[in-house]
From Swiss-Prot:
Highest taxon in the source lineage: Bacteria
Record lineage: Bacteria, Bacillati, Bacillota, Bacilli, Lactobacillales
SUPFAM superfamilies: Nucleic acid-binding proteins (SSF50249), Translation proteins SH3-like domain (SSF50104)
Keyword entries, A-Z: Ribonucleoprotein, Ribosomal protein, RNA-binding, rRNA-binding
Protein name: Large ribosomal subunit protein uL2
Gene Ontology cellular component annotations, sorted alphabetically: large ribosomal subunit
Bias-annotated ranges (Basic residues): 210-219, 252-263
Pfam families: Ribosomal_L2, Ribosomal_L2_C
Coiled-coil boundaries: none
Functional description taken from the UniProt entry: One of the primary rRNA binding proteins. Required for association of the 30S and 50S subunits to form the 70S ribosome, for tRNA binding and peptide bond formation. It has been suggested to have peptidyltransferase activity; this is somewhat controversial. Makes several contacts with the 16S rRNA in the 70S ribosome.
Family assignment from sequence similarity: Belongs to the universal ribosomal protein uL2 family.
Length: 278
């Protein structure tokens, strides 16, 4: 993947960049692996806004991704690398030897024609899925399960990667993208390699319209609101916050406050917290 920079022919193009989509080999998705999805614009079943700044955006079909990778000892050939509008990573279309088709997250370096498989005896190469107990220390992994058989939940965004540090009996030590080191059950599965499309974070939208295509609505600063709408609102002209520290719209401190529950049961599985929480 390479980043395309545009000539400043308009104000919207001046700082715009995009992907060249060189890795994409197929434009139309596999129809049997599509589902319709409706968007709620950040509203719940009562019609109340529960997530602000959501709404609009282009219609999208959901691609059914195989996060479980539990089809053991059946080899599959990579038939295409496709774009997925629902995630930052690209996806790979697999054709299994028994006729089944499936989508997986496309790891970095996976090419059309490559053969991938799952199971404890699979080779250590990008795209193969194994239990953590069968993955040697130092191996880069992604799409990591937290509960055996539930499907990958960790390290699924474009360019992310985790590393196996070693096996400790029932658990395997894994260093995540954030720097956190935690124990994960050795029977949980993970996929070898890092997630592809690693330059996605370098893309600049360049104009407000591209945010609207993605379903993101404008966000107003609290300081330009009325005092009944935000703790920062009110005052004459450009008034300061007027409080010891910035607040959320609901009156809670917004900086330096830990949001993780210190009594969570998974706390005992974390060996070292992420870099921001030293």
């Amino acid at each position: 993947m390479a980043i395309i920079k545009y000539k400043p022919t308009t104000n919207g193009r001046r700082n715009m960049t995009s992907s060249d989509f060189a890795e994409i080999t197929k434009k139309k998705p596999e129809k049997t692996l599509l589902e319709s999805q409706s968007h709620t614009a950040g509203r719940n079943s009562y019609g109340h806004i529960t997530v602000r700044h959501r709404g609009g955006g282009h219609k999208q079909k959901y691609r059914i991704i195989d996060f479980k990778r539990n089809k053991d000892d059946v080899k599959a050939v990579v038939k295409a690398i496709e774009y997925d509008p629902n995630r930052t990573a690209n996806i790979a279309l697999l054709h299994y030897t028994d006729g089944i088709k499936a989508y997986i997250l496309a790891p970095k370096g996976l090419k059309v024609g490559a053969v991938v498989e799952s199971g404890p005896d699979a080779d250590i190469k990008p795209g193969n899925a194994l239990p953590l107990s069968a993955i040697p220390a130092g191996t880069e992994i992604h799409n990591i399960e937290l509960k055996p058989g539930k499907g990958g939940q960790l390290v699924r965004s474009a360019g992310t990667v985790a590393q196996v540090l070693g096996n400790d009996g029932k658990y395997t030590l894994v260093r995540l993208q954030s720097g956190e080191v935690r124990k994960i059950l050795s029977t949980c599965r993970a996929t070898i390699g890092s997630v592809g499309n690693e330059q996605h974070s370098l893309i600049q939208l360049g104009k407000a319209g591209r945010s609207r295509w993605l379903g993101k609505r404008p966000q107003s600063r609290g300081s330009v609101m009325n005092p009944n709408d935000h703790p920062h609102g009110g005052g004459e002209g450009k008034a300061p916050v007027g409080r010891p520290q910035p607040m959320t719209p609901w009156g809670k401190k917004s900086r330096g406050i830990k949001t993780r529950n210190s009594k969570a049961r998974s706390e005992k599985l974390i060996i070292r917290h992420r870099k921001g929480n030293k």
